[in-house]
Each structure stands twice: as C-alpha cells, then as structure tokens.
A protein has these predicted regions:
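Nucleotide-activated chemistry modules centered on ATP-dependent adenylation/adenylyltransferase
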Residues: 1-38, 43-209
Length: 209
C-alpha cells in the first residue's frame, strides 16, 4: 500500500482555490503557540483562518491559560496576509478524563493518545459544521512525536461524520517543524516539554512538543 503524501493533498486544495480566486474559511484546531506558528504563517496566505483552542487534555488550568495567552500574543504580533481570528472553548478537563478512562496506563503514543485526538478533532468538526467553515484541520501533525497518518485518518472520519471537509496535512513537511522553532525563538514563545496531560507529564519526556 502506497504511503499518502498529505502535503501534496494540501497543495492540490490550495491550487484549486487559488485558480478559482477563492479564500476558503478554515477552522484550525491549535494545541499551542509554537506548533501553530508555522501553520498560521503558511496557511494564512491561502485561507481565512479562525483558530480553535480546545485542549481539555491539559491537566493544569494555569498551563492551559498560559498556552492560550501565548497563542493570543503570537496572533497579535505576527503579520498575516488574511487576519487570523480566535475562538476558545471553556476549560473542561473532565472531557479528557472521560474519554481516556481505562487507558491511564497506556504508553505515550498509544491508545490513550488516539482517544485524545478523537476527542479534540470531533469537537473541531462539530464547531466547523456549526459555524459554516469550508474546512477544518489541526496543528498536531507538525510534531515529530505525533502520527500524521493517524491524525489524518481520524480527521477525515470526523469530517465525514459531521459533513465538513477535513484539510489533509503533514506540517512537518517543507521543514515546518524547523520553521516553528525559528518562529518560537523570534517571538519568544513558551515551548513546553510535554503535550499537556498528566500522564505525559509523569513520563518526564524531555523532548519539546
């Protein structure tokens, strides 16, 4: 079975809308400012973007709010071709714990993470459908620690479920992750060393997300 090139899929969508002179509306689920930095710099040239901050996996409220404030700060400081808007969800960690019940001892990158992806992408699909967006996607594929194929599979499934188009991506391509590090340094963005949940924090992962 041939491996899907998600960047090429994204390129095709962009080229089609560019040829038609269209600027489609995109709901972009973001996990944090560093991961969103390159995604926004890149996608804002072609889409009318609203950032959606829904991350109930973040176990500490102060951490949740700090990452949100960094996202807002980056959006306010960075210049974009098309203005970027932001909508946030209330802090609901109970959503996460309910979704991963029974999977607490799973290793990082296992079934618990899959359920967390499903939770956040389903909420994003629902929001995109309710508010009439043309597409929705997530910044999560930029992380070297995240499985882009799995994220795209879940995103497409949720898009089909709610009747809204999933925008395929693998933001690690075109040196996206490297660019996100450069932008994080340029804007002095807070770069955490765990994804957000209490379980990943307990792992003491020294890699930055």
């Amino acid at each position: 079975m041939n491996k899907v090139n998600y960047q090429k899929e994204l390129d095709r969508v962009i080229e089609r809308h560019q040829a038609a002179g269209e600027v489609p509306r995109l709901l972009l689920h973001v996990c944090c400012a560093p991961c969103s930095s390159y995604c926004l710099e890149y996608l804002s040239n072609y889409f009318d973007i609203t950032v959606y901050y829904y991350n109930p996996n973040i176990s500490i409220k102060e951490e949740y709010e700090y990452r949100l404030s960094e996202e807002k700060r980056f959006i306010s400081l960075k210049e974009f071709k098309y203005p970027v808007k932001l909508t946030e969800s209330e802090y609901r960690p109970g959503d996460f714990f309910a979704a991963v019940k029974g999977l607490e001892k799973e290793p990082e990158g296992g079934l618990r993470c899959k359920e967390c992806f499903k939770l956040r992408l389903e909420a994003s699909a629902k929001k995109a459908k309710e508010q009439g967006f043309d597409y929705f996607t997530t910044t999560l594929t930029i992380s070297p620690l995240k499985n882009a194929a799995l994220l795209n599979e879940i995103g497409a499934e949720m898009g089909e479920k709610y009747g809204v188009s999933w925008l395929y991506s693998d933001f690690k391509k075109k040196e996206g992750y490297k660019r996100s590090i450069e932008l994080s340094r340029e804007f002095e963005l807070y770069r955490q060393n765990y994804c957000g949940c209490v379980f990943s924090r307990q792992c003491g992962d020294s890699q930055q997300y």
